[in-house]
Regions:
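Cell-envelope/extracellular polymer assembly enzymes that use nucleotide-activated donors
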Residues: 38-41, 72
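Glycine-rich, basic loop-to-helix element that forms the pyrophosphate-binding segment
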Residues: 104-124
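Short beta-strand/loop segment that forms part of the nucleotide-sugar
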Residues: 69-79, 100-105, 135
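A conserved acidic beta->alpha catalytic loop
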Residues: 59, 77-86, 108
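Acidic helix N-cap motif at the loop->helix transition within catalytic regions
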Residues: 52-54, 82-91, 138, 142
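Conserved donor NDP-sugar-binding/catalytic core segment of glycosyltransferases
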Residues: 142-156
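Short, well-formed alpha-helical segments that are part of the catalytic scaffolds
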Residues: 49-64
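Short beta-strand-to-loop acidic/aromatic patch adjacent to the donor-nucleotide binding site
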Residues: 124-138
Length: 156
C-alpha cells in the first residue's frame, strides 16, 4: 500500500484520518428518528444500580422514537448509597426537559413508583401512557416505536 508523504511522516495522523473518514461514511446509515403519535413516561425506581445506569439511559435515549420529543423519564432514587445519583444527574443535565430526578429515603420499589406518578400528576405533563422500567432492564431500540405504532392503529 502506498502512503502519501504526509502520512509517512506521522502514522498516527493516517489512523486518525482513516477513523474520521469511516465515521463520516457511517453517518449516512444512522437510523432515522420518528416523531410519535403519543408521548410516553417511564417511571424508574433506582436503588444502588450504578453499574447498569449508563446502559439503561442509552437504551432509552437511543430509541427509534425521538427521545427529546416523545419520551420523559422520571428517576426516583430510593435512598441509593452508591454513585447512582451522580449518574442520573449527569444525564439530567444533558436532557433537562426529558429527565426528572427525585430523591426519597429508602422505602421500596412501590413507594418510589408512587412518588413518580405523584410527580407526573403534580407537574401536569399531560401524558397518558406510563410504563415502569427498572434500571437493570434495557429497552429494545424499537420498543416505543412498536408501542406507538400499535396505539396509532387502534385509534384510527
Amino acid at each position: 500500500m502506498l502512503l502519501k508523504a504526509k502520512y509517512k511522516k506521522n502514522i498516527s495522523f493516517f489512523f486518525k484520518s482513516l477513523l474520521i473518514s469511516m465515521q463520516n461514511f457511517l453517518k449516512q446509515f444512522k437510523p432515522k428518528k420518528y416523531k410519535a403519535y403519543n408521548k410516553y413516561v417511564i417511571v424508574s425506581a433506582v436503588y444502588n444500580v450504578e453499574k447498569y445506569l449508563d446502559d439503561f439511559f442509552k437504551s432509552i435515549i437511543n430509541q427509534r422514537l425521538d427521545f427529546k420529543s416523545n419520551i420523559h423519564l422520571i428517576c426516583v432514587d430510593d435512598g441509593s448509597t452508591d454513585n447512582s445519583a451522580n449518574i442520573i444527574k449527569k444525564y439530567q443535565k444533558k436532557y433537562p426537559k426529558n429527565i426528572a430526578y427525585l430523591y426519597k429515603e429508602n422505602g421500596g420499589q412501590a413507594s418510589s413508583r408512587n412518588l413518580g406518578l405523584k410527580y407526573l400528576k403534580e407537574n401536569d405533563l399531560n401524558i397518558f401512557w406510563v410504563t415502569f422500567t427498572d434500571p437493570d432492564d434495557f429497552l429494545d431500540r424499537d420498543y416505543f416505536y412498536e408501542v406507538d405504532s400499535f396505539l396509532k392503529k387502534q385509534n384510527n
